[in-house]
């Protein structure tokens, strides 16, 4: 898949909105592009040839249905999200893991450095109604995680940092979902994952949780791990100590 180079739109009534987005992201405006950010009357989507339109979704109704299965997931067992816990999702992607964590009451801040993915996440947040906002405490910062962590003051360190780096191993599996296939091709491998993990350890109050392919050696020896069928969650205890 080529990099996203254009913003398209469904009808002429949406042209102005699409133009504003194209200007904001420094992309071309092309109504007929077959690979683009695509503006519809309802939402901002990602249009990829041979795929149905893809979009982020943070409606409470969607994610409350997955809360029950979430209790059994390694994600929840590793992060232990509860009301009042502040979690920084340093690699938000489509925001699905962040949404699951938020349904358990955690205050989740998503970081996303890719401008196209950040635009899709921002649009999903803007579509929430009051009930969605009350049930899921989610926010977005369009930023590189390493730069963001360097800018944090000690008093603002999150309780937990969650990292789900892009890994080339995922491209080899036929079972990888279409959203992950697209994300892998759009963003590519996170070559700075080691740097991000090491920095996170000194900028977190409790622990860092890293989602990693089950059969791949961890980047750093973890303090604990929770295994799943295809991935595991490596847990690293904080190296931060307040003066």
From Swiss-Prot:
Enzyme Commission identifier(s) = 2.1.1.242
Molecular function (Gene Ontology), one example: rRNA (guanine-N2-)-methyltransferase activity
Keyword entries, A-Z: Cytoplasm, Methyltransferase, rRNA processing, S-adenosyl-L-methionine, Transferase
Q: Name the enzyme group at the top EC level.
A: transferase
Looking up Pfam families in the UniProt record yields: SAM_MT
Q: Can you state which reaction this protein catalyses?
A: guanosine(1516) in 16S rRNA + S-adenosyl-L-methionine = N(2)-methylguanosine(1516) in 16S rRNA + S-adenosyl-L-homocysteine + H(+)
Question: What cellular component GO annotations does this protein have?
Answer: cytoplasm
Q: Localized where?
A: Cytoplasm
Which amino acids does the record list as binding S-adenosyl-L-methionine?
Answer: 112-113, 164
Identify the CDD domains for this entry.
AdoMet_MTases (cd02440)
InterPro entries noted in UniProt: 16SrRNA_methylTrfase_J, SAM-dependent_MTases_sf
Task: Tell me, in a sentence or two, what this protein's role is.
Answer: Specifically methylates the guanosine in position 1516 of 16S rRNA.
What is the similarity comment for this entry? Belongs to the methyltransferase superfamily. RsmJ family.
Protein's name in the database: Ribosomal RNA small subunit methyltransferase J
Q: Whose protein is this, by species?
A: Legionella pneumophila subsp. pneumophila (strain Philadelphia 1 / ATCC 33152 / DSM 7513)
Taxonomic lineage from the root? Bacteria, Pseudomonadati, Pseudomonadota, Gammaproteobacteria, Legionellales
Q: Which gene is the coding source of this polypeptide chain?
A: rsmJ
């Amino acid at each position: 898949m080529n990099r996203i180079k254009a913003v398209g739109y469904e009808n002429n009534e949406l042209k102005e909105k699409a133009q504003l987005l194209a200007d904001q992201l420094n992309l071309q405006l092309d109504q007929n592009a077959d690979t683009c950010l695509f503006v519809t009357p309802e939402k901002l989507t990602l249009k990829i040839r041979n795929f149905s339109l893809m979009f982020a979704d943070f409606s409470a109704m969607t994610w409350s249905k997955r809360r029950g299965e979430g209790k059994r997931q390694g994600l929840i067992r590793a992060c232990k999200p509860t009301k009042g816990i502040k979690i920084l999702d340093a690699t938000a992607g489509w925001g699905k893991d962040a949404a699951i964590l938020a349904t358990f009451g955690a205050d989740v801040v998503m970081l996303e450095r890719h401008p196209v993915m950040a635009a899709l996440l921002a649009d999903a947040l803007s579509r929430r109604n009051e009930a969605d906002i009350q049930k899921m405490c989610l926010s977005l910062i369009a930023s590189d995680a390493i730069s963001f962590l360097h800018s944090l003051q000690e008093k603002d360190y999150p309780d937990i940092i969650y990292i789900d780096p892009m890994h080339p191993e995922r491209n080899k599996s036929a079972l990888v979902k279409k959203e992950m296939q697209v994300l892998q091709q759009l963003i590519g491998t996170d070559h700075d994952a080691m740097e991000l993990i090491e920095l996170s350890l000194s900028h977190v109050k409790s622990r860092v949780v890293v989602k990693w392919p089950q059969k791949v050696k961890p980047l750093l020896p973890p303090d604990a791990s929770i295994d799943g069928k295809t991935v595991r969650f490596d847990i690293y205890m904080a190296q931060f100590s307040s003066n």
